[in-house]
Amino acid sequence: MVETFESYRTYLFAIAYRMLGSAMDAEDMVQETYLRYQTTPKDSITSLKAFLTTIITRLCMDQLHFMVNPEKLARV
């Protein structure tokens, strides 16, 4: 399971870095994607690359939303 995720780590980091512009934030998103991957039943994933791409993209979009609207983060 870890080896499979690790084969996509560079790809996921590149997506997150392009979206966020920060290596530290990109690494955080990769780690969060891994946690989501860990807690998802593997038999429900039909395409690992598509699943991981969707997760990291949505996480980055959420991060960008909070960067633009920090007052919403305070309410969470």
Where are these regions (language model features)?
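Sigma70-family region 2
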Residues: 31-47, 67
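Arg/Lys-rich amphipathic alpha helix in sigma70-family domain 2
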Residues: 54-74
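Hydrophobic recognition helices of helix-based DNA-binding modules
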Residues: 12, 37, 60-64
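A short, charge-rich alpha-helical start-of-domain segment used by transcription regulators
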Residues: 1-12, 24-27, 43
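Residue-level preference for hydrophobic side chains embedded in well-ordered alpha helices
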Residues: 4, 8, 12, 33, ...
